[in-house]
Regions:
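Amphipathic alpha-helical dimerization/coiled-coil segments
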Residues: 124-145
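Amphipathic alpha-helical interface surfaces
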Residues: 33, 72-75, 90-93
């Protein structure tokens, strides 16, 4: 097979997203908007771990969570622009997610809280995502070359 299996990979990615959404709805009772908001905030507030070798080496495993001082604020404006949501709806949902402990309200916006001990609501989610990536590797290895 000389061509990249784009349809196969695309199908797997869509399944990955669908399963992720289902997991979040079932496990946490999130709405689809809440899942989207948390994804944007988590992605942006932990962006540095993907670009800084020290942070990756120090906090990239399950041994130690990224400390709050390395988590950058994500503004209401950024979230509503990124998701195409109304500002007031975005603000209300962010406040509610912070009130429920899923996000931290910090100076300049919101951040994903450090996931440690009893406060770690994302352990099962991380395990789910890692298993899905492992499944993708298995599927890719089976593609004839």
């Amino acid at each position: 097979m000389d061509e990249l299996p784009t349809r196969f990979i695309s199908s797997f990615v869509v399944e990955f997203i669908s399963d992720f959404m289902h997991f979040c709805v079932e496990k946490y009772g999130f709405s689809t908007e809440e899942i989207s908001i948390i994804c944007v905030v988590a992605t942006e507030s932990t962006r540095e771990i993907r670009h800084d070798g020290y942070l990756l080496k120090t906090y990239g495993t399950e041994v130690q969570a990224i400390p709050d001082e390395f988590r950058f604020p994500v503004s209401v404006q950024f979230v509503c622009r990124r998701l195409g949501m109304r500002r007031e709806t975005t603000r209300r949902k962010l406040e509610d997610l912070a009130r429920r402990g899923f996000l931290n309200k910090i100076k300049g916006g919101y951040a994903l809280p450090a996931q440690t001990n009893a406060a770690d609501y994302t352990q099962e989610l991380r395990d789910f995502l890692v298993a899905k990536i492992s499944n993708l590797r298995t599927y890719i290895e089976k593609i004839p070359v």
